[in-house]
Each structure stands twice: as C-alpha cells, then as structure tokens.
C-alpha cells in the first residue's frame, strides 16, 4: 500500500537556509518574541522611572510631550498582545497545531498592509517627506543632511527601501502560510489518497472444476424405514 499526499505538490516545504517551514516559523516566532520582550522591558522601565526617559522641550525642539502615561500603557498592552501572538505561533508550529498560527499570520498581513499604505502615500504625496523632516527637532541626527538631499532622489531612496522591506515581509508571510498548510494537511487524514494493488483479489475456481468435484462425491446412504 502506498499513500500519496496531494498537498505536498502545490507548495514548498523549505524556506531560507534550506530549513523546513516549521523550523522557519518557529525561529521567526522566537525572534518576534524576543524583540517584543525587549520592547516591553524598556516600556516598563520607562513607566517605573519616567525621569530616565524624559526629554525637555529644548531637547525636542518644540512644545510637545514625548510620551505620556496613557500612551505608555497602550504601548505596553500592545507589546503584551504581540508576545501572546508570537508565543501562540511558536507553540502551534512546534506542536503542529495550525489554528494557533492564524493570529500571527493575520498580524503579518496587517503589518504588510500598513507598509503598503506608507509606500503609496510616499508615491502619491512626495512632498510629505520634506514636511515631515521639517517638523523634526533641530538637533535630530542627520536632519540637515537629509534636508540637503534632492527631493526626487530622497523619494526614490525611500521607495526602494520600502520595496525591499515589503519583499522581505512578503517572503516571511509565504513561509508562515506554507507552514500552516503543511500542518493542516498533515492533520487532515481525509486528504490522503490511497493507492492499492490487486493483491486482495479473490480467485474463484473454474466452473467445470467445481461441478466435477461436486459430482465425484459419494451419494448419501439409502433411507431405511423402521
């Protein structure tokens, strides 16, 4: 008996560095988990000691607040949610539970859509980049150097940078999606196609042999009345 799984023909089971999509998804989930854990630690330390991350109006070059307590709490909640989503994706890929990967995949789609909107905004409104740079504080690193660049060249550089990011994010999305399909296909027993041979065919004797053997039997003894 030979089993053929059709879901193995329509997509690749390998990603970068020739590793399996499950391994790639686990590594990606752990990487996002570490990043969000570091961000959460920074936010918690900033919330515990506001003076350590406090910037005065002279340092910022304007009369606005860097981050208040409400925004800090929102950022902490988002970091906790991201840690939960990344942990679910890592656990789902490790334990081969496809449903646990869906939240992380939805986050990837949402992040890709936001970056696409940024690229469209830069392409449609190229002057918005110069306006955004002018609003930065005067002591912002490399502000004057960026302002001195030709606006057209600056737009092209930013679009090229965003295109590279979108390509990389799209590749990561495909890796996670292939991992979901792989796990979902392995857990579905009804998608397997069973290929069998004729080894179980029942061979019946020829009709002539059956009738001859039946006729050759001795007749029953005669009936004797009492």
Curated annotation (Swiss-Prot):
Predominant subcellular localization, coarse grouping: membrane
Record key words, sorted: Cell membrane, Cell projection, Endosome, Lysosome, Membrane, Transmembrane, Transmembrane helix, Transport, Ubl conjugation
Subcellular location: Endomembrane system; Late endosome membrane; Cell membrane; Cell projection
GO molecular function per UniProt: ceramide binding; phosphatidylinositol bisphosphate binding
Its membrane topology: Multi-pass membrane protein
Region (Required for NEDD4 interaction): 205-221
Transmembrane segments: 26-46, 72-92, 100-120, 153-173
GO cellular component terms given for this protein: cell projection; early endosome; endosome; late endosome membrane; lysosomal membrane; lysosome; multivesicular body membrane; multivesicular body, internal vesicle
This protein's record includes keyword Cell membrane: yes
Keyword Cell membrane recorded: yes
GO annotation, biological process: endosome organization; endosome transport via multivesicular body sorting pathway; negative regulation of lysosomal protein catabolic process; negative regulation of transforming growth factor beta1 production; regulation of lysosomal membrane permeability; regulation of lysosome organization
Posttranslational modification: Undergoes proteolytic cleavage following delivery to the lysosomes. Ubiquitinated by NEDD4.
Pfam family, one: Mtp
Top-level lineage group: Eukaryota
InterPro entries per the UniProt record, alphabetical: LAPTM4/5, LAPTM_transporter
Subunit structure, interactors included: Homooligomer; upon reaching the lysosomes. Interacts with MCOLN1. Interacts with NEDD4; may play a role in the lysosomal sorting of LAPTM4B; enhances HGS association with NEDD4; mediates inhibition of EGFR degradation. Interacts with PIP5K1C; promotes SNX5 association with LAPTM4B; kinase activity of PIP5K1C is required; interaction is regulated by phosphatidylinositol 4,5-bisphosphate generated by PIP5K1C. Interacts with HGS; promotes HGS ubiquitination. Interacts with SNX5.
PANTHER family per UniProt: LYSOSOMAL-ASSOCIATED TRANSMEMBRANE PROTEIN, LYSOSOMAL-ASSOCIATED TRANSMEMBRANE PROTEIN 4B
Family to which the UniProt record says this protein belongs: Belongs to the LAPTM4/LAPTM5 transporter family.
Its job: Required for optimal lysosomal function. Blocks EGF-stimulated EGFR intraluminal sorting and degradation. Conversely by binding with the phosphatidylinositol 4,5-bisphosphate, regulates its PIP5K1C interaction, inhibits HGS ubiquitination and relieves LAPTM4B inhibition of EGFR degradation. Recruits SLC3A2 and SLC7A5 (the Leu transporter) to the lysosome, promoting entry of leucine and other essential amino acid (EAA) into the lysosome, stimulating activation of proton-transporting vacuolar (V)-ATPase protein pump (V-ATPase) and hence mTORC1 activation.
Name of the protein described by the UniProt record: Lysosomal-associated transmembrane protein 4B
Lineage of the organism: Eukaryota, Metazoa, Chordata, Craniata, Vertebrata
Gene of this entry: LAPTM4B
